[in-house]
Design a protein with these regions (language model features):
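Generic hydrophobic transmembrane alpha-helix motif, especially the helices
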Residues: 60-97
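Transmembrane-helix boundary motif in ABC transporter permease subunits
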Residues: 29-59, 72, 223-231
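Interhelical loop and adjacent transmembrane-helix boundary motif
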Residues: 3-9, 13, 163-213
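Transmembrane alpha-helices
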Residues: 30, 106, 129-166
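Glycine/proline-centered hinge or cleavage motifs at structural transition points of membrane proteins
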Residues: 66, 125-126, 139
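Hydrophobic alpha-helical transmembrane segments of multipass integral membrane proteins
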Residues: 20, 24-32, 36, 40, ...
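Alpha-helical membrane-interface segments at transmembrane helix boundaries
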Residues: 12-24, 28, 52-65, 75, ...
């Protein structure tokens, strides 16, 4: 878009810089919020107490946080206090503030739906609490956790004001999130639509259509992944489970066969044979 003016036709310019900027910001935000959000949800479920209730209260309050407040917080902390430039990284941090409570609350609900019988079976086999979380709870709730992450991504991909405050606006392509302004699809839509030229307004509606398509695609993927409840396996997972069951059966069969071969019948001793002969004599 840096070589296209307001009066140029729609065949010139494009929104590649906005698409790549959006993907880069969302990727950085996901790298931050996925481990932090899932860890908070696991902590609230596995370690009940005053601090877990405090974390739940904060996460619930953050869901009603205006996006402009998140943008101002990152702008004041990273740009004004720490001296960072306006960049895609700062915008990703602001977006992560908006995504984090969504992922925490959705993951908390999903982890609560994991059947307690699965955890009790793991404890009965001798597994500890965190080993049960890693090998039983999280794999069982994997589809729900993926849905929570996708819903949080759909929330963050449509934020405008945090990006405007922390990343600025540019018409040039910038793939370096550490320096220089970077634009997203919502911010590009806002900048295009506020222009008085019909061509720029048309560009804004086209950018909004691309953004709507991305959000709709995310919701479709979330619906497909979230169609299964916790513990309900997909076809590929059922095939893997059947394969592992056959392997376990073969391994236990070989073990029992080796044990039976190692145990040989002991011949009777001489003293016992003599006693038997003595008993048989008249």
């Amino acid at each position: 878009m840096q070589n296209a003016g307001p009066l140029d036709p729609l065949t010139s310019g494009g929104i590649l810089h906005a698409i790549l900027g959006t993907l880069i910001m969302i990727a950085i935000a996901l790298a931050v919020v996925i481990p932090l959000g899932v860890a908070c949800a696991v902590y609230m479920n596995e370690m009940p107490g005053p601090f877990s209730r405090f974390v739940r209260t904060i996460s619930e309050a953050m869901t009603a946080l205006p996006s402009i407040v998140a943008g101002l917080f990152i702008y004041a902390s990273l740009i004004l206090i720490l001296g960072f430039d306006k960049s895609g990284f700062a915008a990703a941090m602001a977006i992560s503030v908006m995504m984090l409570p969504i992922i925490i609350r959705a993951s908390d609900v999903v982890l609560r739906l994991v059947p307690g019988s699965l955890k009790e079976a793991s404890y009965a086999l001798g597994a500890g609490q965190w080993r049960t979380v890693w090998h039983v709870t999280l794999p069982t709730a994997r589809s729900g956790l993926m849905t929570a992450i996708i819903l949080g991504t759909a929330r963050g991909i449509g934020e405008t004001s945090p990006v405007l405050l922390t990343a600025g606006f540019t018409a040039a392509l910038n793939v370096n999130p550490a320096s220089g302004p970077m634009v997203s699809l919502p911010l590009a839509t806002f900048e295009f639509v506020k222009s008085p030229e019909p061509t720029m307004i048309a560009r804004g509606f086209g950018t909004a259509a691309v953004l709507m398509f991305l959000v709709l695609l995310l919701f479709i993927v979330a619906r497909i992944i979230g169609g299964r409840g916790p513990g309900n396996l997909s076809k590929s997972q059922m095939r893997r489970r059947a394969k592992r069951s056959r392997e376990d059966h073969q391994r236990f069969t070989k073990r029992e066969a080796s044990r039976s071969d190692s145990v040989q019948p002991t011949p009777p001793s001489s003293s016992s044979s003599r006693s038997l002969d003595f008993g048989d004599s008249p």
